[in-house]
Regions:
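N-terminal start-of-chain detector that recognizes signal peptides
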Residues: 35-40, 52-53, 85-91, 128-130
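Residue-level preference for short coil/turn positions at secondary-structure junctions
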Residues: 14, 61, 109-112
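Acyl-donor binding region in acyl/amide transferases
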Residues: 87-88, 92-156
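Conserved long hydrophobic alpha-helices within structured protein cores
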Residues: 32-37, 79-81, 111-121
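Short amphipathic alpha-helix that is part of the acyltransferase structural core
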Residues: 6-56, 64-71, 75
């Protein structure tokens, strides 16, 4: 007999697919979904109104995940993993550094540290209730974990 966790994972796998956005077309799909969620649904981030994309200077140093509904192929979630590092002899490359005290991340191994951001779930999918919401978050984190393992990351 399977436990409830295994049943939930099986249900997720039947209905959703986690993909890496590893080309320009997939990246733009993730940016369109971010525009939809962050600008149109929540009104919290500026976006490129003409292109209907939510993009910033950190996208180029990021690995992106797309959560897709299997049946329709529709992207319903996205997140990114920003790979940081040293810039000009100091820690750089993470949006959170804009808000942290200087030196706060000094002890982290920058070569294996990343920041998770732009975690977005479509309003349409969020309406599925707490169970669905949890499964979708699980899916995005599964993608983030897969990328982290592939890159040898040790810290988020």
């Amino acid at each position: 007999m399977q436990d409830q966790g295994s049943d939930a994972v099986s249900m997720f796998d039947r209905h959703f697919l986690v993909e890496r956005a590893d080309n320009q077309s997939a990246l733009q799909e993730a940016q369109r979904l971010r525009h939809q969620v962050f600008r149109l649904e929540r009104g919290i981030l500026p976006g490129h109104a003409q292109a209907r994309l939510e993009a910033d200077e950190f996208d180029h140093a990021s690995h992106h995940v797309i959560l897709r509904q299997r049946r329709s192929g529709q992207a319903v979630g996205t997140a990114r993993l920003i790979v940081g590092g040293w810039q000009d002899g100091r820690i750089g490359g993470f949006p959170m550094l804009r808000y942290c005290a200087p030196g706060m991340l000094r002890d982290l191994p920058m070569g294996t540290t990343a920041e998770i951001s732009r975690f977005a779930l479509s309003k349409v999918r969020r309406q599925g209730g707490a169970c669905m919401d949890g499964l979708l978050r699980y899916g995005l984190m599964r993608g983030i974990l897969r990328i982290s393992l592939d890159l040898g990351l040790t810290h988020w």
